């Protein structure tokens, strides 16, 4: 396919993800005030933990009330504990313990653990209107795990005279760090073009610091210069969605490699995991 537009670059990335275990979710399903995809959270819990969900329905006197009460518990936990904690440790509603993510078991011998891991719902959302302060503002791509936004990406294509520098500038100037999706939900933000990737874990207007997320000119772990290895077909940055965002790798990264120290989130560089 001839890639001539930013939207085509975006579509190509999405197409790869959808062919490898991700789902496409509608931007309209996002609750801006809560900062979640509520129905996806409920569907994940129903699929992975049917008994606890039935307990919640019984204790709250019906499914509609259980849904409302449980989502409030999730939002409160995200607001007070943070996304990583909520993904890694259960939330409790009316004495019922519920997990919001399952990580890969050490072996495949436990059928129930494997089934729960496979129930994780990874979603990609394009052009998400996320902002309460500026409803017209939209993000090129948002990655979601079981209804919780975990990463954003701004995608640029040099063929439209835009590159990774423009993506970083967009984060610095056009994105409000106080919007809930940035201040209390997502963990990392990627600026991406076909040749280079940069990332940051914290938006702070002009003070935002981006770090390179490239492999190096000779590939990860090899001596070379900045950038990425040359390719004859495809994109030099395809490792981002083919390897980093690969379903098992992404869940492993969320489960083991991201660290939170106070208000600081430590996200590993490409060569560190």
List the predicted regions and their residue ranges.
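ATP-dependent helicase/translocase motor core
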Residues: 2-273
């Amino acid at each position: 396919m001839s890639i001539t537009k930013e939207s085509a670059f975006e579509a190509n990335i999405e197409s790869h993800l959808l062919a490898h275990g991700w789902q496409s979710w509608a931007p309209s399903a996002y609750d801006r005030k809560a900062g979640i995809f509520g129905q996806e959270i409920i569907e994940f819990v129903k699929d992975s933990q049917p008994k606890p969900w039935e307990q919640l329905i019984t204790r709250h006197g019906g499914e509609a009330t259980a849904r409302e009460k449980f989502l409030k518990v999730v939002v409160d936990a995200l607001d007070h504990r943070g996304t990583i904690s909520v993904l890694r440790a259960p939330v409790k509603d009316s004495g019922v313990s519920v997990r919001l993510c399952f990580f890969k078991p050490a072996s495949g011998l436990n059928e129930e653990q494997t089934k729960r891991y496979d129930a994780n719902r990874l979603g990609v959302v394009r052009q998400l209107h996320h902002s309460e302060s500026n409803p017209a503002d939209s993000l090129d791509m948002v990655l979601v795990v079981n209804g919780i936004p975990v990463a954003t990406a701004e995608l640029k294509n040099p063929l439209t005279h835009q590159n990774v520098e423009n993506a970083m500038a967009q984060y610095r100037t056009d994105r409000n760090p106080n919007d809930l999706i940035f201040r209390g939900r997502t963990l990392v933000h990627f600026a991406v073009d076909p040749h280079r990737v940069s990332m940051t874990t914290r938006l702070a207007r002009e003070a935002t610091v981006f770090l390179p997320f490239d492999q190096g000119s000779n590939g990860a772990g090899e001596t070379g210069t900045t950038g990425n290895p040359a390719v004859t077909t495809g994109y030099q940055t395809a490792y981002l969605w083919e390897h980093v965002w690969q379903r098992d790798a992404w869940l492993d990264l969320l489960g083991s490699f991201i660290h939170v120290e106070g208000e600081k989130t430590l996200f590993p560089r490409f060569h560190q995991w």
